[in-house]
Design a protein with these regions (language model features):
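Glycine-rich phosphate-binding/hydrolytic loop that grips phosphoryl groups
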Residues: 96-109, 255, 262-348
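Adenine-nucleotide phosphate-binding core of ATP-dependent small-molecule kinases
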Residues: 16-48, 183-254, 280-281, 325-326, ...
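Short glycine-rich, Thr/Ser-proximal phosphate-binding strand/loop in the N-terminal lobe
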Residues: 1-34, 38-41, 45, 65-68, ...
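Solvent-exposed alpha-helices and their adjacent loops that cap or buttress functional pockets
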Residues: 120-128, 133-136, 314-315
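Short beta-strand scaffold segments in enzyme catalytic cores
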Residues: 1-6, 133-135, 140-145
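Glycine-rich phosphate-binding loop plus the immediately following alpha-helix
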Residues: 95-99, 111, 151-201, 342-347
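Short glycine-aspartate micro-motif
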Residues: 47-51, 131-135, 244
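Glycine-rich phosphate-binding loop and adjoining helix at the ATP-binding site
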Residues: 21-33, 46-49, 58-128, 254-271
Length: 348
């Protein structure tokens, strides 16, 4: 567990890392209290709130953690974590899913405002207000922000990890994307199922930095990219906004992004055989300068107002963009937690 403090959107003390002790509830909660108390003592003043990410399932609005938590088994029967910390430190406590906070941080202080600023600088009238954030790591996390508001759902259960995998409709897509999938797929493609490589090692193999099956490594990342893109296409169809990807696996984006983009740009057919896009908007890779230039340009044109000597700007091209996080997942989650707390305090 990592503890820190922010002011003005920036860290103001050195982060503190402590073991989670997740299998023993008393020790885990004691460690949390120690971590927060240590940070507060460094501040010299009382914080206005505590806000952080915690894995679900959970009733996040009420601060209750409970259910099937593989990494926090001692919480499975239900723990009123928010109320406990609020009473311990006498401040409001806000808990959210890490995928939600990643997306919120990117929407308010990352890729969304950055993209809109670049569009303005390019002379484009197009602006974006909606965003999907995905994290690639131990899981396939997601968060959705609509018009500046975090979509927490009615059950704190906005997820896409459980969408079906494109090649095995009975398997969740997360099992074809997460770290464990990268290791498994590389083992299958290389014929070395007993390997001990981590995703970073498999990336280094693809790059030719260490011995291994480079072709299998490259194909591994292509496979996870195709699976992720297929799932993202479903979500993007419903949210119609920008997509940002974060997490440790994004270092290998040169190998997974082509297949991911191919899936997003894929075609689907009607019963009569007519072809249409899997996503109705054109998808641009915002990290490629030439694609961003075309993205900013769109199909902007002047349209005469009927019956008046006046023109308006019209851009009929429907388009969305995807990019790798510049903030990084950890910073984006922290920014999301910080901004979420301030927003909630304003409403109190």
């Amino acid at each position: 567990m990592v503890f820190g403090a922010m002011k003005g959107g920036e860290f103001i003390v050195e982060p503190l890392t402590l073991p989670a002790h997740s299998d023993t509830l008393d020790l885990c909660l004691d460690t949390m209290v120690t971590g927060f108390r240590t940070i507060i003592e460094k501040l010299g003043e009382k914080p206005v709130a505590i806000s952080f990410a915690f894995p679900g399932p959970a009733d996040y609005p009420n601060g209750i953690i409970g259910g099937y938590l593989p990494n926090f088994p001692s919480f499975r029967d239900g723990v009123a974590l928010g109320p406990f910390l609020s009473r311990t430190f006498s401040v409001p406590v806000f808990i959210n899913n890490d995928g939600d906070l990643f997306a919120y941080g990117e929407a308010l202080g990352g890729i969304l405002p950055e993209t809109n600023a670049k569009l303005e600088a390019a002379g484009s009238s197009k602006r974006y207000h909606n965003l999907i954030g995905y994290t690639f790591g131990t899981g396939f996390g997601v968060g959705i922000v609509v018009n500046g508001q975090l979509n927490r759902g009615d059950n704190s259960c906005v997820e896409t990890f459980c969408l079906p995998h494109k090649d095995n409709r009975d398997m969740i897509v997360e099992d074809g994307i997460a770290i464990k999938a990268i290791k498994r797929i590389y083992g299958e493609l290389s014929g070395d199922s007993d390997h001990k490589f981590e995703p970073k090692d498999i990336f280094d193999i693809a790059e030719g930095r260490i011995p291994g099956d480079a072709e299998a490594a490259k194909k591994t990342f292509a496979e996870i990219g195709a699976a992720a893109g297929d799932a993202m296409a479903t979500a993007a169809t419903l949210t119609d906004g920008l997509i940002v990807i974060g997490g440790g696996v994004t270092a290998s984006h040169k190998y997974f992004m082509p297949a991911l983009l191919a899936a997003l740009r894929g075609k689907i057919h009607t019963f009569k055989g007519e072809e249409t896009g899997r996503i109705q908007s054109k998808v641009y890779n915002l990290d490629e300068p030439e694609e961003f230039e075309a993205f900013a340009k769109g199909d902007q044109q002047k349209l005469k107002v009927y019956g008046y000597d006046e023109e308006v700007i019209y851009d009929p091209q429907k388009r969305i963009g995807i990019a790798i996080s510049k903030l990084g997942a950890s910073k984006a989650i922290s920014v999301g937690a910080y901004t979420f707390a301030l927003g909630q305090l304003d409403r109190m």
